[in-house]
């Protein structure tokens, strides 16, 4: 069927190779390659450049990609409507999220959902806010769990307030505070996390008319925690990013408090039953997780 060949082409573009696309689709590598070649032969155009360095889209492939992606999405939605009519809890939910959510929320949430509706599968892509925003607009994912830009084309509902916490070495002078005023950080080297959510922190600091001199900039929460543990400086991280490393350092909330807002975001109103089930159950499962901590 042509739709199967469309899926093979789309998966190859998204995965970057026939081998990875084959793993996603549960086909052999040669079968995926052949389906893409069949499309090229059927249409009389080259869709992919095949080089030793990897696969890239040709101009024709780039021009046709949005249409092929739309057809695959429409076919998935059609199946969803049919499943809704017959009452079947089946389908695929495509999620895009940030690292902290993928590490701390999704294992527990997806385990419970798969017990409740074993016929539903989940695909999880991990990226930063800008990338997830693009995935939603390109229809590569159904749901985003992140902090979106202000965009009227996306539906966003607040899901969680992730509190920013000051982290510092054990035995540090800041440990005398129950809540740390920002002015107290000006006396210590500050390590900045170079992530997109830092803009939200920066906006909060500007609103409070506070400025913290940055001494170091790096990425990766674990790297920052290890630098802080070694006495290199202090930092501010969202609480979710500290879950696995909080025993290594001390932490306190800010005074006044600041939060990273995490939203559940969709592009339009979801119609597929599997996506509806995920959106309906997610808030309750997160509340249950919070009570169990």
Where are these regions (language model features)?
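Short beta-strand->loop
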Residues: 155-165, 239, 247-261
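Hydrophobic hinge/microswitch elements
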Residues: 128-133, 137-140, 146-147, 196-250
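A short LG(V/I)-centered, amphipathic sequence patch enriched
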Residues: 40-59
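Short helix-boundary/capping micro-motifs
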Residues: 11-28
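Central regulatory/effector-binding core of bacterial HTH transcription factors
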Residues: 86-152, 218
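A late-sequence structural motif
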Residues: 251-292
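Secondary-structure junction motif
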Residues: 188-209, 272-279, 289-290
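Flexible hinge/capping segments at coil-to-helix
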Residues: 87, 154-164, 168-190, 273-276
């Amino acid at each position: 069927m042509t739709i199967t060949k469309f899926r093979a082409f789309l998966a190859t573009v998204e995965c970057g190779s026939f081998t990875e696309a084959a793993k996603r689709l549960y086909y052999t590598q040669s079968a995926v390659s052949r389906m893409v070649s069949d499309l090229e032969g059927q249409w009389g155009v080259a869709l992919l450049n095949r080089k030793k360095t990897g696969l890239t889209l040709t101009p024709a492939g780039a021009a046709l990609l949005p249409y092929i992606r739309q057809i695959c999405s429409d076919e998935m939605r059609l199946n969803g409507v049919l499943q809704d009519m017959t009452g079947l809890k089946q389908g695929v939910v495509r999620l895009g999220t940030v690292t902290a959510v993928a590490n701390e929320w999704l294992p527990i949430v997806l385990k419970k959902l798969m017990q409740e509706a074993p016929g539903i599968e989940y695909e999880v892509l991990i990226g930063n806010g800008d990338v997830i925003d693009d995935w939603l607009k390109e229809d590569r994912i159904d749901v985003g769990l992140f902090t979106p830009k202000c965009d009227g084309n996306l539906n966003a509902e607040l899901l969680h307030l992730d509190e920013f916490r000051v982290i510092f070495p054990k035995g540090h002078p800041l440990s005398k505070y129950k809540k740390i005023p920002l002015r107290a950080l000006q006396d210590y080297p500050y390590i900045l996390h170079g992530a997109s959510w830092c803009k939200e922190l920066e906006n909060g600091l500007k609103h409070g008319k506070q400025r913290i001199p940055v001494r170091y900039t790096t990425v990766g929460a674990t790297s920052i925690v290890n630098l802080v543990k070694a006495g290199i400086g202090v930092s501010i991280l969202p609480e979710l990013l500290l879950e696995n490393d909080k025993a290594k350092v001390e932490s306190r909330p800010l005074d006044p408090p600041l939060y990273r807002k995490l939203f559940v975001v969709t592009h339009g109103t979801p119609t597929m039953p599997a996506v509806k089930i995920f959106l309906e159950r997610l808030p309750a499962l997160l509340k249950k997780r919070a009570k169990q901590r």
